[in-house]
Amino acid sequence: MGGNQSQPNATAIIGTGKGGPLDTSAGTIASRGISFTYDHAAEPALRDITLTVPAGECIVLCGASGCGKTSYTRVANGLIPSFFHGAFAGNQTTCGLDVETVPIDRLTPLVGSVFQNPKTQYFNANVTDELAFPAENIGLPAEDINRRITAVAERFGIGHLLHRSIFHLSGGQKQRIAVAAATMLGPRLVVLDEPTSNLDANAIADMRAMIEQMKDEGLTIVIAEHRLAWLNGVADRYVVFDGGHIVQDYEADEFLSLSPGCVAAMGLRALDLQPYRRRIAALASSPAADECTSALLGTHNLTIGYKGKDGFTRAIPDLRFRAGEITGLMGNNGCGKTTLVRTLTGLIKPVSGRIELNGVPAKPRDLTRAGFLIMQDVNYQLFSDSVREELLIGLDETDAGITAQANQVMADLDLAAFAERHPMSLSGGQKQRVAIGSALMCGKDLIIFDEPTSGLDRYHMEQVGELLRQLASQGKAILVVTHDEELAAGWCDRIVNLGADDSGNNGSHVSNPDASSPSPNASTNFATTSTHERNAQ
């Protein structure tokens, strides 16, 4: 591991033991009149932000996509203006240091950052190496690094993940490793940007436990987040952004007492998921859909998975997906949801059984031609240099009708302003909408969405729901893989709950539905239900 380079203040900054006793006197964020415009951007991302965060406090930054939450996290951790360049005004001190004048390596040991997509911050393929990386970077001796790895693993309960390949971890496990790595240097401040956007209920519970642990140790915590319900009882303050401004700064009790209507009017996600969970539980106790109705796609004695020594397999009860119907596929990470949709779209072959299209046995290539899959990580399927070109891939750009359709899709998805922007320059939520736009342009009969509302605010989540309904009304069969209980309760006609078995293994066990389960995402049952009601209340 790394050698002992000259770092005179490293020991004082980092402490001892499990991160050491924290000197929280410098763990304050102070922003005074902060404004920032990214290079080549027409409008400021932040406008006259004044905010103070006392040491040891946990604050939540919330608001619609593009409101300035992520930009402010970059100011708080010093990435603006040292890494993201543009016009910066105001005064920002983080952990007692002026971010405009202090070298970024002075801030590094004091601030831990966790980004929305943990893949963007990994430097190693092995969990242990990833945890060691921050300490190696500042030249700590190998003995100290090993001690820190042991302490962090014990603190966050991740000892069983040490030495494993990061590529073999679930989304929740990857995010836990990212948080653990961010605390390796004993920071005074931890900044998290939408840490639960891709997580299921169990993984969110793990994330909450990590936040509580850090808060108990006296760390200052800043979380930019759309999904708010999981933070009840953890956050001390909620700061609402809009158009680059801070429009409200609530104490937790005041914020949690707001009516659902007031929360919705601010464009925020629900603070209480119980009405949505009751809705899904009610669906889980409803009769199955009419089996006499013809299905666009059906499965018979299907087993999905991967062959080999460490292969995953799962038996799937017979399913039917009908034109004009929105089916929600729910369940914990690792239960086989993504494997199932890849099988249904012909990307991988089933282990056994068959899949039918319009009652006729289908080969994988037939399924590929019939369906369109929007992947969970849309970065893998964005290829063009502009949003407009992305929507027109494979289509005749000289056809006025197709061009008009693309313009309408961009307008419907609130993407018209980004028509000439490179897709990779957009936010996570905007990229999701570009991929949804591609699905609307493809004209196929089966459209499968893998976590389409990941990273989306309330307005755009509801917009996705409306688009799903629009597609269904056009006779499309829609399958939505989702952890989003608001989306599932409000917009799905049927729910398929695909959970792990009672022993926690993701195998072939299927049990009867338990309608009393408080959280459909945390259920260990498999249930299919049907309804045409979409009132989450």
What function would you assign to each model-found segment?
Residues 62-64, 330-332:
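The feature captures the beta-strand-to-loop junction immediately N-terminal to the Walker
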Residues 190-193, 447-450:
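Catalytic Walker B motif of ABC-type/P-loop ATPase nucleotide-binding domains
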Residues 85-97, 353-367:
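Conserved ABC transporter NBD signature motif
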